[in-house]
Swiss-Prot record:
Detected in root vessels of protoxylems, outermost metaxylems, inner metaxylems, shoots and hypocotyls. Expressed in roots, hypocotyls, cotyledons and leaves. Expressed in developing xylems. Specifically expressed in vessels in the secondary xylem of the root-hypocotyl region, and in vessels but not in interfascicular fibers in stems. The NAC domain includes a DNA binding domain and a dimerization domain. This is NAC domain-containing protein 26. GO terms for molecular function: DNA-binding transcription factor activity; sequence-specific DNA binding. Keywords: Activator, Cell wall biogenesis/degradation, Developmental protein, DNA-binding, Nucleus, Transcription, Transcription regulation. The gene is NAC026. Residues 7-156 form the NAC domain.
């Protein structure tokens, strides 16, 4: 018999798995005295789980776990299976056994069992759970079907806390419906911030249509759901603000000029950019639509002001211009040389242009004017190519 069944006030009995196996069970198997003999001996297979609350009670405090020693017996004298049946049901093992270690040494195993009402295989599962601890030195060894074990019995905890009936003012079915609606609404609110979709109003309308029948009619009577709807409306405004800022940034980068000339006036460009940025900052208190329009106008004006300069300072255009001038120079030189050879005319290419020197051959008036015009064109082309090449060298 147990010599001590009570603990002093203020003490609670909550041993760990290691303490149950290495101290209490080991001393029980070795028939050694336990200093505070607080765990009772119970024949688990002759008592129902609901009776354990009174039989294994410790002190006057409310308990959620009950501990006891039990001696395992075989189901059949010649068999190897353990008898786990009671008068009202049976205990069924579930899952794998858990190993219990102390300082990297195996000391025991823990088996989890669930109580079923009725007889197998048509038993009804209950909320009673039992952890059965046994001494073991080999994790892969054959478990002993006889001997002492220490058990912890408790009820399975519910997933959600149930309110007391006194806290409600209507029927239990209505309370369940209220909890379900609040849960579904919270799921909608919590999942919506992760979806940055442009057509958010359509998504919100789609959620309302997929909710169970009666939700829209119940919104006016549920203050929690109304508060969540206000939060969702506030979130919609935030999403619209972010989308407008995103479009504004895209327009800013799309409308920038492709290439800036190193010889352009940087001071004027900086002044224009500073003026445009200050205008955008001053219009921060205006509506988002006006900000978007002003931003587009400012950057479009900046782009068009630099359009003329860009056409003349673009390196690719300049390269094509130089190539065309060089090709024109070669053609003009070939024409002049051929004309001078045919007419026996000497061309003086000094400094300013061409001079036709007559060697006694009388040229027609039209031919001489044509030679002079061609010489002037060649001089102008040569001067333009020389200036453009100097700019490139700079």
């Amino acid at each position: 018999m147990n010599s001590f069944s009570q603990v002093p006030p203020g003490f609670r009995f909550h041993p760990t798995d290691e303490e149950l196996v290495d101290y209490y069970l080991r001393k029980k198997v070795a028939s050694k005295r336990i200093e505070i003999d607080i765990i009772k001996d119970v024949d688990l297979y002759k008592i129902e789980p609901c009776d354990l609350q009174e039989l294994c009670k410790i002190g006057n405090e409310e308990q959620s776990e009950w501990y006891f020693f039990s001696h395992k017996d075989k189901k059949y004298p010649t068999g190897t299976r353990t008898n786990r049946a009671t008068k009202a049901g049976f205990w069924k093992a579930t899952g794998r056994d858990k190993a219990i270690y102390i300082r990297h040494s195996l000391i025991g195993m823990r088996k989890t069992l669930v109580f079923y009402k009725g007889r197998a295989p048509n038993g009804q599962k209950s909320d009673w759970i039992m952890h059965e601890y046994r001494l073991e030195t080999s994790e892969n060894g054959t478990p002993q079907e006889e001997g002492w074990v220490v058990c912890r019995v408790f009820k399975k905890k519910l997933a959600a806390t149930v309110r007391k009936m006194g806290d409600y003012h209507s029927s239990p079915s209505q309370h369940w419906y209220d909890d379900q609606l609040s849960f579904m609404a919270s799921e909608i609110i919590s999942s919506s911030p992760r979806q940055f979709l442009p057509n958010h109003h359509y998504n919100r309308h789609h959620h309302q249509q997929t909710l169970p029948c009666g939700l829209n009619a119940f919104n006016n009577n549920n203050p929690n759901l109304q508060c969540k709807q206000e939060l969702e409306l506030h979130y919609n405004q935030m999403v619209q603000h972010q989308q407008q800022n995103h479009h504004l940034r895209e327009s800013m980068f799309l409308q920038l000029p492709q290439l800036e000339s190193p010889t352009s006036n940087c001071n004027s460009d900086n002044n224009n950019n500073t003026r445009n940025i200050s205008n955008l900052q001053k219009s921060s208190n205006i509506s988002h639509e006006e900000q978007l329009q002003q931003g587009n106008q400012s950057f479009s004006s900046l782009y068009y002001d630099q359009g003329v300069e860009q056409m003349t300072t673009d390196w690719r255009v300049l390269d094509k211009f130089v190539a065309s001038q060089l090709s024109n120079d070669e053609e003009a030189a070939a024409v002049v040389s051929s004309s001078s050879h045919q007419n026996n005319v000497k061309i003086d290419t000094r400094n300013t242009g061409y001079h036709v020197i007559d060697e006694g051959i009388n040229l027609p008036e039209n031919d001489s004017e044509r030679v002079v015009e061609m010489g002037e064109e060649y001089s102008n082309a040569h001067a333009a190519s020389t200036s453009s090449s100097c700019q490139i060298d700079l």
